[in-house]
UniProtKB/Swiss-Prot annotation:
It holds the Pfam family YidD. It is a peripheral membrane protein. Belongs to the UPF0161 family. Could be involved in insertion of integral membrane proteins into the membrane. GO terms for cellular component: plasma membrane. InterPro entries: Membr_insert_effic_factor_YidD. It is found in: Cell membrane. SMART domains: Haemolytic. It comes from the Bacteria. This is Putative membrane protein insertion efficiency factor. Its main location: membrane.
């Protein structure tokens, strides 16, 4: 189930997202957040967290850095600074070329 959900999000990222204007107010983007939540918390809790994040991502909020926390929550990550090194490492030291 988890692989199926991640696959669906990847299809969205590859084929649908490039056609739409960028609107996500968070880093990482909502689709990346969904994948990270699915990997970290499994299909059910990860899906719930990802949907909660998509609902939070709207024009009436400030946005900002909001990585997936290590525990289940439907709220914004209260301590994104704890994940700052991990985010920087992923963004700048990726093995992808």
């Amino acid at each position: 189930m988890n692989k199926l959900l991640i696959g669906l999000v990847n299809v969205y990222k590859k084929f649908i997202s490039p056609v739409l204007p960028p609107t996500c107010r968070y880093y990482p983007t909502c689709s990346t957040y969904m994948i990270d939540a699915l990997k970290k918390h499994g299909a059910i809790l990860g899906l719930i967290m990802g949907i909660s994040r998509i609902i939070r991502c709207n024009p009436f909020i400030k946005g900002g850095v909001d990585p997936v926390p290590d525990y289940f929550t439907l709220r914004r990550n209260p301590h994104p600074e704890r994940y700052e090194d991990e985010i920087i490492a992923q963004a700048f030291h990726s093995n992808k070329k």
